[in-house]
Amino acid sequence: SKQAHITASKLMDYNVDYALINRKMFDVKSKGRLKVEQYLSSSMEYYLDDRCAMITITQEIIDKSGMEAAEFEGIASLTLQVEGVEVGVTVKQREENVYKISMRSSNYVDVSALCQKFGGGGHIKAAGCQINGTLDEVKKKLVNAANQAIEEAK
């Protein structure tokens, strides 16, 4: 936001190592986080002529990673790092047959409206919801909804 940039510029008047802060916030990741990102990147699924990318984080993946659940925050943006992807979907298991969905849009698709169909919401380019069902059922619902949203946005 505008205010965040104003505040950041004021901090530069003090002897703050903003380059170090930036590096620690955006560039440095734990080995566990990098391993998880590597695994998720290699297992990413593509739908709708590669316009939709989906990663799935099961409880098994969380357990094997040794990471805390909070360390998975921000992983949703991984799906938008692929050229041509318009809708990125992260499906994270909360418990058996309960999934937290995070969606990101790279361009014109309103993922907030998409998530509202499942009782969620958010912003045009970042939104979320929760869907109950088997993993296959959840993925099918998401791909169908993403397809509709992409077609409507054209």
Locations of regions flagged by a protein language model:
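Hydrophobic helix-and-loop "lid/oligomerization" segment in the mid-to-C-terminal part
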Residues: S1-K117, G122-K154
